Amino acid sequence: KLILCGDDAQIPPVNEKDSYAFKGVTSFRLTQIVRQDEDNPIRTLTELLRGDVYNGTFNFLNYISRNRSKFDNTMTKGFVVCNSAQFQQEVVKQFSDESITRNTDYVKVISYTNKAVSNWNKFIRESIIKDSEKSVITKNDLITSYVTIVDQFNDAIIQNSEDYIVKEIANYTHPQYELKGFMVKFQAVFGGQVTSPLFIIDHRDKYTMAMYCKIADDLIQQAKNARRDIRATKWKAYYKFKESCLLLVNIGRPDGSILYYRDLDYGFAISSHKSQGSTYNVSMVDVMDIVYDKYGRPYPNASDIN
């Protein structure tokens, strides 16, 4: 038997209204709240949000517009609503706390769009890492993987949504593709395992980025145009290239859409999709990015993530 656990008040999968995993199966609903104590003011917020999801209301936004902060008697559990300037200041303060060196889940910035996640990662890294502008990746950088990569024995080297610390780093030019970048060993935040070396593209090198796109485009065309008996081999060559030359940034088209998605990102901010199910000591939610698009209109659905 297979038991699946879900929450119909969470954000659905991208481009899906509901999860297919829960269609046409026997289900049981658990209603007791256990993740927040009864005296935790955050519990009120989550109950309002859940009600808004079910009823199509905006009670959560109305509530935080009237109640700018609330804490329990110990002043250790609660929330504060900030304006943009205050939020930035608080972000720098929280990520400068020594607690994050012992617990990388101590604090996260949570945004709706991938663009906002990238902007926050850049802002935080430049705020807390000395000389961060000198290199796209440095020793002790906090990195989140957006992909799972396995070795020849099908054992995971890095896993999707897991956090890693840069353990060792060296400048490197890929011997096969002649792309500039860095050879990096990561250490898993949870478990402490050190990975085998992985090659990361230096996205500040314009020639390297142009050649990356050319190689990837050529390999895709070769696979699409290949005879049926060798098509699988051609696609394997493309994915071998992708996994051996990892990206820290998205590569976009002129119209703003994404051509090639990043494989890794700095681990200070996270999308609301990826954050679901996680627990942080301090959650810094970019409500404006979640509620409004760049034109000041509410997001109609999850497909608007960019």
Q: Which stretches of residues belong to each language-model region?
A:
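C-terminal accessory regions
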Residues: 177-306
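Conserved helicase motor core of P-loop NTPases
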Residues: 5, 9-160, 165-224
